[in-house]
Amino acid sequence: MNHLLESRVVYRVAGRDYRELIFFSFMAAALFIKFYFLEYEISRFVVRFPLSVAASAAISAAAVISVSLFWRRGRLPLALLLDFLLTGLVITDLLHMRYYSDLFTFHNLGLSAQVGEVSESVFALFSPRDLLYFIDIPLLYGYYRIFRRISVHPFFRRITSRRAAWSLLLFAAAAGVVAFHIAGYSKKVPGVLRSMWDRPAVCSNVGALTYHLADSWNTLTDWICRRPLSEAEMEDIREWYEEHLSKQRRPQGIFGVAEGRNLIVLQVESLQSFVVGLKVGGREVTPNLNAFIKEASLASEAYNQTGAGNSSDAEFLANASFYPAASGVAFTRFAGNRYAALPKALLDCGYRTLAMHGDRAGFWNRGRMYPALGFERFISKKDYVNDEAIGMGLSDKSFFRQSVEMLSKEPQPFYSFMVTLTSHYPFSFPKLLAQAGFDTGEYSGTVVGSYLSAIHYFDREFGAFIKGLKKAGLYDKSVIALYGDHNAIPRWDSPTLSRLLGIDFTKDHHWRYVQRVPLVINVPGVKKLAWNQKMALGLANLPRTLALLLGVDFESGLGSDIFDAAEAPVIFRNGSYVVGKIFVEPAKKSAVHVESGEARDYAAYAEMTERVRKTLDVSDKILEYDLMPKILRK
């Protein structure tokens, strides 16, 4: 006893009470190690950047410093609670990566009701060694219980002005490291922290803790800015929607013309209309697509309607017929909504519904959004044999070959939504250029030249895909729709494209007009579908069009069908639109002919401009408040 008292006196006199410093240093190190190993797990899916480790270390230190400045009696429970919550976040991320190939996002808290449906699969991914992530919590508590008695001083000391100053200095340094890193990444990839188009990639660049801070901020601002929808507003939306549905018709000779057929929809990465029929050095860029179009029906005036979500927005338009989100990305923000999309409508009619893509399931949140749209199964990168990777994922050659094999074994009728990948910007993947075997002449080494090679490669594999469908006996049993998802060539490379096409892209109307994407539909036994080939169209028109052909009632979404003779505007996310050949831009109060550039009277489009504004407003509210179940409730 005397020895203990003596030691306590010595400890007090010497002033060497490092117990609290050791406690919080160990806690900070433990948190850093947890997130380090989380990021190591993520690095199996994406490239890891060393600076992400520094960002996680800085935030771990800042979090611990914050706790160390609290009221003395509250520090222990607060420290253990913080450690437990952050460890739970690490485990949640690990399980999400193993199951979805994606990270957890607070936006998907609305999906918590679905956890029970996949709980067995998720817990099967939990390893007993994952419990080691929690080991520091009892160690911290045990350390406190043992060492609090070795000094007459309290374990947690009062905050002196010197300690507060050092703590604030360290906190500011940590915050500065993170802020500097975020600013650099945001400048390099503008808007990525808001859109979160690839969460693992964001995490690998800025660190797991920084990713979660940005995700929390996005979710919080979305919730705070979201006001309750009044009953009057709800009734106004319902009336607008009923009026919209009342204008829809069943064109004679169209409804059910392909009843009972399979449906194959092919979304082609970066395919633009100008390559259709184009020759370079006497060779067709897309000979197989050209041949397919001769048997099918081509909408030559279809426009890209995507927003910040790029490819995912095209998928959303083509399956749900809603416009891109006003902010952020629909696929990441509204995966918890209840949709009555085309896949769901076909599923209810006895179709097998599949989505097929050679990329990770977590990219663009597809692993969560596809089931919400009504796809029974998502065949992603992990389900394919990754025998040939080009660029961002599985090559089109391997993707098409394996997909035909899978489809030949599926019960019919089925709806297969397929997304290609190889012709992705910047198109200059060495293996792709080598396999394309397309001489682009004077354009070799340019973005445009690489793009032409990439599309020629796609075209060759598309031809093999069509042959594969015929060999499997699926071609004559299937409606096949094909479209390009968005534009390919950036504006800064327009001089090269101008030289190729002989068009002056310094004039905005020419640049707008070249942003068209091909939309092709082939119905077995039907040579050409009867629609106005000169009418401007968008992907929002596709779901109802396909439903009509298959004889399925489709009452969801905001698009009409391509057989509707009424000239409807093709609406873009920024509120501009094309009607016929006139491009109307309300922000500039201008209306111009897309081919000639001739100015038109903007005032003449006032009524349609208001109609477009209302349509976007309805689309936004339906998504923000998940209104489809209420609207469709009879």
Go through the PLM ranges and name each one:
Residues 217-242:
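Membrane-anchoring hydrophobic helices of lipid-metabolizing enzymes
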Residues 95, 122-129, 141-154, 227, ...:
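Short secondary-structure junctions and interdomain/linker hinges
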Residues 238-634:
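Solvent-exposed soluble domains appended to multi-pass membrane proteins
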